[in-house]
């Protein structure tokens, strides 16, 4: 039996759900770029080089969009760009994304991950 996700009272198959999640991450990067262009600040404390890369390329290498509220547990948030935060991935000196999942990507997340304190809130 194929898995379906109830998203805002509409049922999506796994492929549709994956596309929805990816779309939210892409939109979050666009929003982040606009925010940095307008204010000079971002949703995280980007280095000057990272800001330049974001403005030039629309994203920052080594970072990925993380759904703060688990898309699997809270499917209504899967397509919400405001549910995305940018975390260092495993190719960096730290793996904030894995840390947000408490060491196992199968562990759901439920909130903002504070990399400094290494805690979800």
Protein language model annotation of sequence segments:
Residues 1-64, 69-121:
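Nuclease and nuclease-like effector domains acting on nucleic acids or nucleotide cofactors
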């Amino acid at each position: 039996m194929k898995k379906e996700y109830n998203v805002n009272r509409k049922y999506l198959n796994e492929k549709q759900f994956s596309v929805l999640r990816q779309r939210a991450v892409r939109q979050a990067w666009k929003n982040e770029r606009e925010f940095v262009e307008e204010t000079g600040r971002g949703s995280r404390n980007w280095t000057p080089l990272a800001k330049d890369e974001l403005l030039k390329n629309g994203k920052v290498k080594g970072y990925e969009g993380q759904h703060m509220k688990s898309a699997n547990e809270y499917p209504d948030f899967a397509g919400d760009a405001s549910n995305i935060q940018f975390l260092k991935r495993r190719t960096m000196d730290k793996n904030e994304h894995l840390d947000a999942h408490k060491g196992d990507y199968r562990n759901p997340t439920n909130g903002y991950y504070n990399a400094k304190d290494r805690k979800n809130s």
